[in-house]
A protein has these predicted regions:
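Loop-centered beta-sheet repeat module
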Residues: 2-6, 20-23, 156-219
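Outer-envelope beta-barrel architecture signal
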Residues: 73, 188-190, 271-273
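Extended terminal
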Residues: 2-20, 62-63, 234-240, 250-252, ...
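Extended lipid/amphipathic-ligand handling interfaces
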Residues: 64-66, 95-105, 131-145, 170-185, ...
Length: 374
């Protein structure tokens, strides 16, 4: 049989070309969409910077770039400087770099990574505090009108003063916030969680010199927006809405001392702290001397004498056996003012900590006035 090429079946080249053309068109369309989304992101960043500047908070990037094609949008800001002028004490902040990433298919989730150091100073002056870390990341899900949750995690966080003296450090620290489902915006309630590992604050408090671990679960009621404002203004608005900070569970362990607490705190119209905490402690006798050394918190037997005298009248002879002039404040509190309680299988002491219009008391002992928040 003679072969005739013209009689051979023709290949359907369009079957090959059509998928290829579809991929090319899809790639062009996706590229156009990505560049449009990147442009929108840059516009939102610029608008946000202008809005903050009008409110007295100036954010400046030494260099700002956008990238992440094809599936992410990355906004990178290097040589960051922030000047906050709307607070009682203006502050200037400097940070090496911020990288914010969002997936194109999930634009409500933002992940940020911070590169230190972070330096704080008075405007135009040398830094008075510097923070460093090995890793610092944050994530935010939601929109300003419908927030969902936010988290921040830091590893190897260290804070020092101008002389290089340590103020605070933590091997691991993380904070989480989540809006309770259905509570926003009419009756907002925000679940809070904090975790610290090997944290110490020698420059912040005398009883935070030794490393401690902390786990805290709480609920913040009454926070209706997340607009950045001066802290006094934010707290005043929170108080006017009947805001309340509910501590569901707090656990702090430091050496042989262990403390757990529950309770609720709020602010009065004058901005003073109000509420009560139930504190359960193992090793209270080790905690009290450090508290007594803190400036402005004078835990002394002279201040405890009225309470001890009242107990002596109720139980004649008990005060004589534990006379103030013969016993320390620790022994007096443990023997007379503390209520025995089981704390994680060990014997401890339960003491109420009360705040009434800013006046703080440890059990029946007044310990001073907490400054007004606004």
């Amino acid at each position: 049989m003679t072969y005739h090429p013209e009689l051979a079946p023709r290949r359907r080249s369009w079957l090959i070309a059509t998928p290829l053309m579809f991929v090319i068109v899809l790639g062009i369309a996706w590229s156009g969409f990505w560049y449009w989304a990147a442009g929108q992101a840059e516009t939102r960043i610029n608008d946000w910077q202008a809005q903050q500047a009008s409110a007295g908070r100036v954010f400046i990037c030494g260099k700002q770039t956008l990238g992440g094609y094809p599936f992410r949008i990355e906004a990178r800001c290097t040589d960051v400087s922030v000047e906050v002028k709307d607070s009682r004490t203006p502050v200037a902040l400097k940070l090496k770099e911020i990288l914010v990433v969002s997936q194109v298919w999930d634009p409500k989730l933002f992940i940020a990574e911070f590169t230190g150091p972070l330096m704080a100073s008075d405007p135009g002056e040398e830094p008075y505090a510097t923070a460093t870390w090995t890793l610092a990341q944050a994530s935010v899900r939601g929109t300003p009108n419908q927030p969902d949750r936010a988290s921040i995690v830091a590893e190897g966080l260290k804070l020092v003063d101008a002389a290089g003296q340590p103020l605070f450090d933590a091997k691991h620290s993380e904070f989480h916030a989540r809006v309770q489902f259905g509570s926003w915006p009419n009756n907002p309630a925000i679940d809070l969680a904090a975790n610290l590992k090997a944290a110490s604050g020698p420059g912040l408090s005398p009883y935070a010199r030794d490393p401690l671990d902390a786990d805290i679960l709480a609920v913040l009621h009454g926070m209706k927006d997340f607009v950045v404002k001066p802290l006094p203004v934010l707290l005043r608005e929170w108080q006017e809405r009947g805001g309340r900070f509910e501590i569901q569970s707090a656990r702090i362990a430091q050496g042989e001392t262990l403390a757990t607490a529950t309770g609720a705190l709020s602010l009065t119209q004058a901005g003073r702290l109000d509420g009560a905490l139930q504190l359960n402690v193992i090793g209270l006798e080790k905690l009290l001397p450090a508290i007594a050394q803190q400036k402005g918190v004078a835990l002394s037997l002279e201040r405890a004498a009225p309470a001890l005298n009242a107990i002596d009248r109720a139980v004649p002879g008990l005060g004589a056996r534990l006379a103030p002039q013969a016993q320390s404040i620790s022994a007096g509190l443990l023997g007379l003012l503390g209520k025995p309680v089981d704390v994680e299988g060990k014997r401890g002491v339960s003491v109420p900590v009360r705040f009434s219009d800013g006046n703080a008391s440890f059990g029946p002992i007044p310990v001073g006035q907490v400054p007004a928040a606004f």
